[in-house]
C-alpha cells in the first residue's frame, strides 16, 4: 500500500473504520545512526559519530535510550522482521502483517528507539534527535501508507525547544499527537506548561509511555526503588503513570488548560479506579491545599485523559474483567493498543474477548475516533 491509498479513500470508507491501534512502534534500520542524514551539517559533525553515523551496525547500543531491562526471551516478536531487516523497520512489511493481517485501519506510531529520550542530560542533543526523528518518520512511514499516523516526538528537557518543534511539526500530514518521553519531573509541574499551552493551541494530545530508563539515569522517571529484573520492572510500570496522573490532577493542569488531552500508553489500567477513588475522597477534606482543583479529580480524568489497553489485564476469574471495565469507565477512557512489534503484543481479534460487543467497539474505535477527532480520518 502506498500514498496512492490516500487518493483512493472515500467518505464511505472513512465511516467504516473498525479498529484504531493507539500504540505501534516503528524502528530504524540502523538505530539512531539512521537519523544522522536528517540533521544539519553542524549537528552531524557534533554528534553524528556518537550516534553511529557512518557505521552499518545498529547503534542503539552506542546511546542506550531504552531496553535497559532485558527480556531474556527477546523483546520483539520474531515474526515481525522481514528477512534481512530488524523487526518493524519496514513500513511495507508492517502494513501487510499488522494493518492488513489484523484488520487495523489506523496505527499511531510511537518512536521505538526514543522511549528513553527524556533521560538524556543534554537538552539540545535530545531536541536535535527528536527533530531528526520526526522528519524521518514522516518520510519513511507517514508518506508510505495513509493508514499510519504519527506522534511527533519532543524532548521535554527544554520546553522552549519542545514548543518550537511542536509549532514546526503540528501541521504535517498524519500527525495526531505529541509523544513526550518521560522525564524526572512529574507532569503536573510548571516546567511543562509551555508544552501544554502549545499542545492545546494546536489541538494535539500529549502521549507518554514507559521508557526503559526508569531509576537508572539521573534524569529518568522515578519508580519507588530500582527493580533488578525485567519482570519486576514490567509489573511495576503503573507506578510511574499513577504518580504522573496524580500530579496532573492535583496541580490543576486541566483547569489551566481545559482543552488539553493526555494519553497514558502501556501503563496498566487497574490502578485507575483506586487512584480516582482516593483522590476524590481526599479532595473533600483537603480542598484548601489545592483550591485550583474546582471539581472532583475523577471528573478531569474522565474528560481529559485516556489510557491504552496493552498489556490488557487478565484476571483469573473472567467475570471480574467486566466489573473492572465498569469501575474505570472504560466505555469512555480506554483505547485499544497492540504494542506491535513487542513480545506481549495484543491481537485485536481476541484481546478483548469476553467483553460486550458494544464496549469492544467503544474501545477499539469510538473512543480513539472521538479523542483524536478529524486528524485520525
Report the location of each language-model feature.
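Helix-coil boundary/capping segments in enzymes
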Residues: 1-377
